Each structure stands twice: as C-alpha cells, then as structure tokens.
Amino acid sequence: MKKIDVKILDPRVGKEFPLPTYATSGSAGLDLRACLDDAVELAPGDTTLVPTGLAIHIADPSLAAMMLPRSGLGHKHGIVLGNLVGLIDSDYQGQLMISVWNRGQDSFTIQPGERIAQMIFVPVVQAEFNLVEDFDATDRGEGGFGHSGRQ
C-alpha cells in the first residue's frame, strides 16, 4: 500500500471525526467528512465549500487524487460535487475542500462529521504533444457525440 503524507488541520479529526479509511478490503474510495462547527443547510441549487480538516501531500508525480460524490447522497438527495470531480495534484499541500452542490429539489442539511465525498488515488501519465499535419486514418475518423449509436 502506498503511503501518502496527511496533516490534521482540525483537532477533532481522529477524535470526534474519524480519519478517512477504506470501508472494506475492496473499497476504492476513502470517505471524506464535513469538518464543520455547525450544521449547514443547502437550499436547492446552492453550493458551498466544506472543509475536511485534512491536508495531503501526494509527492509522487505519477499519482493524483480525485474527489467524487458519494452515490447515495447523489441518488437519494441530489447532493453532488459542485465541480463534479475534484482533482488533487501531487504537489498540492493545502486543505482538502469539498465543493458541495444541492441539485435536488429539497433543502439538505450537512451535519458536522457527515461523510459527504470520497477520494480515490489514480495513476497519472504526463504526455508530451507530438505536432503533426495529419493523423493516420481510422474507421472512426472524426465521428463523435453519438457517432457509434445508442444500441
């Protein structure tokens, strides 16, 4: 298992609010919690930035972290990430903040310590562009946006 440096920025993390952990041996994501002093009510259509009380430093340029919504919150309550996916670069060292968006039709209250997002680590390949005048022909060519059909 890869070691990632984590800094606790809020003393409640690890005491009142558990550290992020994998729920099962097959879990891909670590749950991130709302490190709030008081509950926050999100009206339909509203967004807010929620602190996690944690900072990470991945350090390895072949890795990045991605923050994703929790499926139950999105499906049952319309609570997703305001930026849809949060990308954490390997050299970022600041607090992990979660942009939360209520795309549902009812107000939703985020409680202190509530699990509101998940974080996964993914490999990164940095590419170098090779400038060309033309591409080698393929069957697909420039077809996109539904080009391959629905069935």
Curated annotation (Swiss-Prot):
Superkingdom assignment: Bacteria
Gene3D superfamilies: 2.70.40.10
Binding site for substrate: R70, S71, G72, N83, L87, I88, D89, M97
Cofactor list: Mg(2+)
Enzyme Commission code: 3.6.1.23
Main enzyme class: hydrolase
Keywords: Hydrolase, Magnesium, Metal-binding, Nucleotide metabolism
Pfam families recorded: dUTPase (PF00692)
Keyword Methyltransferase: no
Biological process according to GO: dUMP biosynthetic process; dUTP catabolic process
Role played: This enzyme is involved in nucleotide metabolism: it produces dUMP, the immediate precursor of thymidine nucleotides and it decreases the intracellular concentration of dUTP so that uracil cannot be incorporated into DNA.
Assembly and oligomerization: Homotrimer.
Family, as annotated: Belongs to the dUTPase family.
Protein name, per record: Deoxyuridine 5'-triphosphate nucleotidohydrolase
Lineage, highest ranks first: Bacteria, Pseudomonadati, Pseudomonadota, Gammaproteobacteria, Enterobacterales
Gene: dut
